[in-house]
């Protein structure tokens, strides 16, 4: 703060007439110059003696504002030295002060800035005028003290004892990567089993071949409809979209369409009348007695058929000898049985109604009926499955199909709540197994025959 006082005492001859003058109290002053150190000290002494500021101003011929400012600064900081208003303070971050702050911080890294300030004053490194503020100490710690910890390698080596050495990080061998060896990670399945994993080139080749096979399968489905490329957006790249489409276009079930590009398996075209003749011949060959229908696993062939407008496209695939394709409706013994080729006038190869292996559980009855009365697979204690539209079963016949057990009884119900209702509220038969609601569909209209219903006839 620049204190321009108008109460300078002294002979007028010592003042510059051009820059000075007399104040209202008759005291001489100089513009732009602070009050002399002697006058400042006299103001403080009179204040300690108990003289009022107004009396000090009259005695020393110094303005009242100057006396008040000097005394206020003295009571606050203990200093009577003049400052500069609006100017910069004298540099407090001297090399000596910075070194001391660094020493304190190294001795106690958790020391606060105000503790460092108090210690500087206590040890006499700084006085009240030269001690840095708390913000200045924090700035010194950030900019200067922390730079001492980031010393170059040469200075660090010089500070080490003769028995200590520094090893650069580049000289340390990093631990072996889990994917760096040919057997993969030690803790992975491939590593435990000793399976060699393909390298990056091998994986890239596999991915390329996989994508190529996916493209072939996508191209072969020309009748699938609108191309998926129309659904693409510019937010995705070309390769991620191809990979996603490849996984979605894969068929998880046996292929049910004919293709001219896929010539891996033999295909034959059978018309609907020819297939119906083969079905009729197959039904006529079945008898109502226990007939053992053998099979030859080495020559077993499975077929998958798809109904279109006027023709059946049946894809013939050679299946493995261990796979067993069986139809529950074509079994008459507990063993898995398939149909042999049928010798008839029309040269139609043998076929099974289902191309995929069907696992049948439970026990099969030895009762084989002709026509529609074909008994399917049943589970112990459960009613048999009767397709819709086949309601020619009597309650006694159905009761005979169900395995005997303690869960079901053929006797009439004698419960009081059941007997409370009239006969019109109950089923015609008092037995649960003879209920037409569950096991007879004669009173209901049969749905129109479909292609799947034609296979149920076998």
From Swiss-Prot:
DNA-binding region: 18-144
One GO BP: pronephric field specification
InterPro entries the record matches: Homeodomain-like_sf, PAIRED_DNA-bd_dom, Paired_dom, Pax2_C, PAX_fam, WH-like_DNA-bd_sf
Record-level GO cellular component terms: nucleoplasm
Compartments where found: Nucleus
UniProt entry keywords in alphabetical sequence: Developmental protein, DNA-binding, Nucleus, Paired box, Segmentation polarity protein, Transcription, Transcription regulation
PROSITE patterns reported in the protein's UniProt record: PAIRED_1, PAIRED_2
Molecular function terms, GO-annotated: transcription cis-regulatory region binding
Principal place of residence: nucleus
Main function: Probable transcription factor. Involved in kidney development, acting synergistically with lhx1/lim-1 to establish the pronephric primordium in late gastrulae/early neurulae.
Entry protein name: Paired box protein Pax-8
Organism: Xenopus tropicalis
Classification of source organism: Eukaryota, Metazoa, Chordata, Craniata, Vertebrata
